[in-house]
Amino acid sequence: MSSYNVKEMMSKKERLAPGHRMCAGCGATIGVRAVLRALHEEDHAVIANATGCLEVSSFMYPYSAWEDSYIHNAFENAGATLSGVETAYQVLKKRGKLPKDENFKFIAFGGDGGTYDIGFQSLSGAMERSHDMVYVCYDNGAYMNTGIQRPSATPMFADTTTTPTGKESVGKMQNRKDLASI
């Protein structure tokens, strides 16, 4: 079994270019960079990114911080978008339209609102059909780039703009959705 070599990982080429508009120290940026570093140098990546903070901060047409192929899609369809791209890739490879030695990886990024709620149906379908893709949910417990509203990922008793805490409310009354179990 091989061990994780931090120096080796950190020396890999950056696939998320500097100059994006993410906040300094943002967890999404750190997570994206870690996921992309897991790729081999020779891998080609196709990234689908649901509308959200990561998308609006890393891709503002005509500027993009993404070094790999990048698709911006709506909140609800990162799973559907990437499953379609992955299927097209498999068909083209099978028909000999793509070189056999090229390796593509398919990665979707979505926030908790776009994953747990709005995009759950398309993600569920992609997983049920066993598409060869990785879906990364950036979970910060609320719809952060639209005013901190509560998705089903918000923990019980959390204070959001739609579940405020105070004299008349204790915050969100429901348990957080257990997405991994579903």
Regions found by a protein language model. Give the residues of each.
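Cofactor-binding active-site loop characterized by glycine-rich and histidine/acidic residues
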Residues: 2-135, 143-144, 148-159, 172-173
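ATP-dependent adenylation/pyrophosphate-handling site
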Residues: 139
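Internal, well-ordered alpha/beta segment that forms a basic, Gly-enriched binding/recognition surface
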Residues: 162, 167-168
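A structural motif
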Residues: 171-182
